[in-house]
Amino acid sequence: MPTSTMPLDTKGADGTGSLPAVRAPRFNWTRGLVVLLTCVAIFLPLFLVFYQSFLTAPFFMPDKMLGLDAFRFIFDDPDFWLAFKNGMLLASGLAVIAVPLGGMLAFLMVRTDLPGRGWIAPLLLVPIFVSPMVMGFGYVVSMGPVGFYSTWVKDLVGFVPWNVYSFASIVVIAGLTHVPHVYLYASSALKSLGSDVEEAARVSGASPWQVMFNVSLPMIMPALAYAGVLVFFLGFEVFGLVLVLGDPEGHLVLATYLYKLTNKLGTPSYHLMAAVAVCLVAVTMPLVMLQRRLLKSANKYVSIKGKGARQKPLALGKWKWAALAVLGAWILVTIVLPLTGIVLRSFVEYWGEGVKLADVLTLQHFRDIFDQPSLVRGIVNTILIGVIGGALAVVCYTAIALAMHRKADGITRLLDYSVLVPRAVPGLLAGLSFLWVFLFVPSWLDGILRGMDNGLAMWLSEHAIPLLRQVRSTIFALWLAYSVVWLAYGMRLVSTSLLQVGPELEEAARAVGASRGRVTRDVTLPLIKFGMLGAWLMVFLIFEREYSTGVYLLSPGTEVIGAMLVSLWAGGSTDLVAALSFINITLVAIGLGIALRFGVKLHN
């Protein structure tokens, strides 16, 4: 049947034959500002670290020149290579311990009928939210040569059968405290699998342990590989544990070598510290990129599932008690011993052999804390940076996530890679780099302004620059460093909520004429408000336990518990460290309780 055709009307609205002009897309200034500020906050500190590493003296010295003297010095220093070797051993040992144990605990918690899983699950995540500095101190006062449990065991058997100061003990403790990181990824992968193959293995006579090692864990190998790279990378970030446990026998890793450079030379050796920092980033950055590659390639694996991914807990039977013994041993060594040691030490006047606990109970350590204004400020600042700073950080993370939301362009790819960069920078190094930002940028701007021969430049130099210099001594400096260090983590929390918003809701709003800004304000943000609340509580927990980022930013007005613990430990104030650690644990416990009460998914 013939079809009729109609001529295409190519006349424009003015009646001419020209087509209407295509309107050029408008530049989104809000998005541009978010991208600019994000890139400055990420790359400016890192640039200063690289710049300082290629100077022959600290950047504020007039005789500084470009050169490789800093790298020559550290490469000729035997302590650097000892720290590097120890760092490799620590990272490797950490992965060897944490990956199989984390996978095993995930299998027991997710795939079996292990009793008590409901209350055990949050307990497994405690080491993630307790500061490593606090954990290290907990092992000293509980299992050190004169620790509580060491003296009690010595009274029973006549000697202490362990040495927490040995490097092997440090590796074991670090491995055990990083098990939850592997557990999170392994349990998430196991929850997505059906149980048909496991049931078939059980029917054929396989024990629960054979099912775990031969069926379940091999099916989540991509997740275990990702977690393995993660904990290997985290091994190079370990600072607090080695600082506390490694000092008595002189064990160094790169982070503690960096921290002790000033003490070693007697003067602030910023160029040498920067060279060590560059070496650290050179190791960690490829690991972060490898993580990203593994995460993307993991999506290509197809897991064997039953119909509807049906899951049925495997009956442990007679193996139930063995499973509980493994789980109980990990909880005892990793959580109970160090934390109870801190609680006991914070309430006793002193401790040693032959001392009876009931005779030395006291509250004096807490009185001493509240008698010192700097420590009181540290507690208040820690709460403020967790509550208010955490909320502001989530707002910033949300703005960055919205700048990437459903926009598959070059800017999104730039941000996607940029937010991973801070993850490759250990907290100690990040704090140092921000210190240099607050020292260098005002001086650099002042030099530019003084070179301009006009009244406005001179006014800015005399009035604005002094205010800019004072930022270093404010809590804002610490908040900015914290927010950048935990950028990748915060982005993951917010992005998880954004991905749950169906695109059809936003498209419907756009179809009726709503602008992109109004869609965000009236549709997207209201739908993710509970996700943002959960993100705020999680960021609060992370900010409360953070310690290494504030070490180099510590000054009157910027005291926080984490940095004060490092300072007090260096000064030998064991009593104050114990009481302050107890306060820090209490704050984390309160935040954790609130998060659980509101149903926040801690596995995020």
Over which residues does each language-model region extend?
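Short cytosolic juxtamembrane segments of multi-pass membrane proteins
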Residues: V197, N299-Q311, L505, A514, ...
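Glycine-rich helix-loop "coupling/hinge" segments at transmembrane-helix boundaries
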Residues: D63-K64, V141, G240-T267, G354-D359, ...
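Juxtamembrane inter-helical linkers in multi-pass membrane proteins
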Residues: D63, S207, A298-A315, Y350-H365
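Alpha-helical transmembrane segments of integral membrane proteins
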Residues: G15-R23, L290-V326
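Membrane-water interface segments at the C-terminal ends of transmembrane alpha-helices
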Residues: R26-F60, R72-L190, M219-G240, V244-G246, ...
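Short helix-to-coil transition segments within interhelical loops
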Residues: K191-I220, K407, V501, E507-I528, ...
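Short, intrinsically disordered terminal tails adjacent to the first/last structured region
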Residues: M1-L19
